[in-house]
């Protein structure tokens, strides 16, 4: 429950910060929200996240381990990377970037929860190996993307697309290799 509570806080506060930047590219200029109001709202979101995280741990229809929560962060990262792929070549403004990365991160969490967390109980070390598999796959995918693009433009959609596919493949291979216990 403690790890889920902290994760709930981090997700809620991160979401509040991203929504602040999605609504205004420079939220602290003279026309935007003042710093004290933003800090108060972000703190309130974090507090709400504590309760949401505890609630999630209590009502989840499956066993929830600390490793499962770490695996959700890996899914959030891959989801955000996939969203970055969709907008990388279009010169988006900062509001679009914040909204896309936020949505991609949340979709990554939902997909990871459905495919990995509900089915398996991950230990901390297994979750670390899953994350490492994702990083290794992303690096290999970036290499393929740079070779395919013929230039070292790391911000192109093609390169990020291959990195995302590599990360997904790395996570899948790590899951296959470690063979975590089925959900109890």
Give names to the regions the model predicted.
Residues 1-184:
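Hydrophobic alpha-helical membrane segments
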């Amino acid at each position: 429950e403690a790890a889920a509570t902290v994760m709930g806080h981090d997700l809620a506060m991160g979401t509040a910060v991203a929504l602040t930047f999605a609504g205004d590219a420079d939220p602290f200029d003279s026309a935007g929200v003042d710093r004290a109001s933003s800090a108060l709202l972000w703190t309130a979101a974090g507090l709400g996240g504590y309760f949401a995280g505890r609630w999630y741990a209590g009502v989840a229809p499956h066993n929830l381990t600390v490793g499962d929560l770490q695996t959700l962060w890996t899914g959030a990262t891959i989801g955000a990377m996939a969203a970055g792929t969709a907008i990388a070549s279009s010169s988006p403004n900062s509001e679009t970037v914040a909204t896309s990365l936020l949505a991609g991160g949340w979709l990554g969490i939902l997909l990871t929860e459905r495919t990995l967390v509900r089915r398996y109980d991950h230990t901390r070390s297994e979750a670390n190996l899953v994350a490492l598999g994702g990083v290794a796959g992303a690096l290999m995918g970036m290499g393929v993307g740079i070779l395919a693009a013929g230039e070292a433009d790391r911000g192109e959609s093609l390169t990020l697309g291959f990195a995302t596919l590599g990360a997904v493949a790395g996570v899948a291979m790590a899951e296959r290799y470690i063979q975590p216990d089925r959900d109890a």
